[in-house]
């Protein structure tokens, strides 16, 4: 990528809309727009004060064609999104106007922007760091209000500031270590070792605090993969319909109606759920149903959360017991349905098998217990804590991996200090921790990783 050229792209979604926006960034942005834009007052944009919206038309002078009626804004660098000169053309929405305007801009000397290149330039030009750049994509793809708020906080630098503070503390450690190494002809005193150990352990705690938020952050970013399991005709499809508040799955009294998994994406109290209603798990000779059962088991193994449904009106069957044994090692909710009927189920046996898992009594036909189910989901995701809008969460898997590597290196450093190993070994561990944290903010990343990150962005962002 060349920062000295001028790029252009359509910045709005494809399709019919009220307006469309074409964005230009680079040192030739003003020169290019003045070749194609005619303002109503007849002035060139270079003769109009920046940060004003100017009415006029986009004209293809070579073909003597008026392309569209537009509003154009010019923002002079460095106080822009990319820190470069930026022009935005607001035209009529739809595929044709933006496409024709972009083609004209490219003919006048701009280059078609790569995916995420505007944000990448903002990063490379120092306006934002890499964590903030990634937050832009999280903001665009947020599935819930909470996810949006967390992304906005990261865009404003909440994670970056926390990571930078830890990195600065690691630099202080490195300074102490290097001074001690410079005087290597003298023994390292206990005071120095105690100080380094104290610093290391305090930084360890801070990294662990960040890592503890990663599971919740991942759910807010990607959704909670939740699988409803149970034997046939226990109410799995009815639960899916009740949570969706619409009839999505077929509900009958015939066991085995759901032959394949049904997947829905929706929000419950700000939690994005990827909810999968699976075929009932049982022994069957039906080939199609058997395939569905095998798929159910595959979804079960990959799930973040299992919702196991049992039938209160029947005694526990070998199938129930088999599924409960599988659930023991997973994060799970146990829902006992059909509590409106005479109870035949052994609750003590359920508790004996699943242990501390939450057991909720519900009746889908009477619509009772659903609120408690929603509350349990919130408790599982937020681990019983109340999350404020300005909560700092680690939502990016790349950030989590970097924090884990930093923690591992720092833990090695702590052990080296405790064992009174040469400080050169400690220095390597502390430097590795610093490098790992630098990957979050972009201080220690290569071009290949940057390309990989930004290729997932939208064109025009």
Curated annotation (Swiss-Prot):
Residues binding K(+), per UniProt: 233, 252, 254, 257
InterPro entries, per the entry: G_TrmE, GTP-bd, GTP-bd_TrmE_N, GTPase_MnmE, MnmE_dom2, MnmE_helical, P-loop_NTPase, Small_GTP-bd
Domain of life per record: Bacteria
Binding positions for (6S)-5-formyl-5,6,7,8-tetrahydrofolate per the UniProt entry: 23, 88, 127, 461
Keywords per UniProt: Cytoplasm, GTP-binding, Hydrolase, Magnesium, Metal-binding, Nucleotide-binding, Potassium, tRNA processing
Family as reported in the entry's similarity comment: Belongs to the TRAFAC class TrmE-Era-EngA-EngB-Septin-like GTPase superfamily. TrmE GTPase family.
Name of the molecule in the record: tRNA modification GTPase MnmE
